[in-house]
Amino acid sequence: MARQLPITNAQDPLHESRQARLRLASEGELPSGMLRDEIDASWRRSLGHGLDCLQGEQVGLGMQQSLDLRALLEHNRLLIDAVTPELDYLVERQGKSGIVILGDAQANVLAIEGQKHVLNREGLRDLHPGSCWSEALRGTNAIGTAVVEGRPTLINCGEHYLDRLSPFSCTSVPLPDPRGEVMG
């Protein structure tokens, strides 16, 4: 017979992040000890950037952004060409449940593959090639936080700084160049 151990002082990280966001929105202050350490640090950086956790989408790809996208893709051509086979492999393996994104060292989105219809959901309409997902612009998110931390990052639903991203869980892995610098 399997022995069951009682769970004491268990915390639900999603509940804790919801409570932290509610307190932040109502009191203007982030309570300590409610979030995982790396999420707490990222939320504090997001606050330092002056972001509102209730900020809406920033939809739109204007003419200047289109021109910038072409330059961005050309600047990152070696990275894109090098990782395309791996992106294809990941899309093939992840099935019909998500998307795979390639970003650069500044958290600019270079490519999106997979179930792109997911992007039509509220909260993700401003996620497209050429959009920047740095912590300074979007708060805690897998792409931007992995760039800052320089290590694999999991943002589980409500741990995103922006409330509108709470339905989504995201993982990001930095791609280092031969010198160990994050290149994507």
Each predicted region: which residue ranges?
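Short hydrophobic/glycine-rich mini-motifs in sensory/regulatory modules
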Residues: 175-184
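Fold-independent oxyanion-binding glycine-rich loops
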Residues: 105, 157-159, 173
